[in-house]
């Protein structure tokens, strides 16, 4: 597939200027399931209402940074990028000039990348595998709603954003610590 440079301004973020390379997912044929179970708005509203109507309940947001980018690919993909888009210092540092073919550098994608159609489902499967030993599971008939087996913690999950209802800071920290084992997280 091809590489595309995406520039974005996000004033709510610590670093509002955002530049990233995405893969042209429209050219990738992925033969397996691509849909990711995420919470819908009614599910989120129910958790919010439950928070305000449950004694001592609190609500927080958790964001996993670079969740897709840290996920190993089940099968590798390949991408080409014009060498003219790569800064000279990077070309020199990685000795890319001899690897250039017809003006392009060819790359093997071994971890998730924005634009790949399978990035979401792979990241979600890995998250599920990593949270299960800590007692977290997705409720069977409500996509994107997760609970803990015994602790008063539940959350909605949309991509890499958690809306967490909890009772007691210790219980909230249980989820944060479980996530911190494998991810860098931000909380609000």
Model-derived features: positions:
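Long, low-complexity, charge-biased intrinsically disordered regions
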Residues: 1-188
């Amino acid at each position: 597939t091809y590489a595309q440079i995406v520039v974005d301004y996000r004033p709510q973020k610590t670093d509002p200027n955002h530049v990233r390379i995405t893969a042209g997912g429209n050219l990738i044929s992925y033969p397996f399931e691509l849909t990711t179970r995420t919470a819908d708005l009614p599910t989120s509203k129910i958790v919010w209402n439950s928070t305000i109507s449950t004694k001592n309940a609190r609500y927080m947001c958790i964001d996993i940074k670079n969740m897709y980018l840290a996920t190993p690919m089940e099968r590798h993909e390949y991408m080409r990028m014009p060498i003219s888009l790569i800064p000279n210092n990077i070309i020199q540092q990685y000795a890319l000039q001899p690897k250039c073919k017809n003006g392009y550098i060819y790359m093997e994608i071994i971890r998730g990348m924005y634009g790949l159609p399978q990035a979401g489902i792979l990241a979600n499967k890995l998250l599920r595998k990593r949270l299960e030993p800590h007692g977290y599971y997705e409720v069977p008939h409500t996509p994107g709603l997760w609970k803990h087996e015994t602790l008063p913690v539940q959350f909605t999950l949309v991509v890499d954003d958690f809306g967490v209802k909890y009772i007691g800071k210790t219980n909230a920290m249980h989820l944060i610590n479980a996530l911190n084992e494998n991810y860098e997280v931000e909380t609000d």
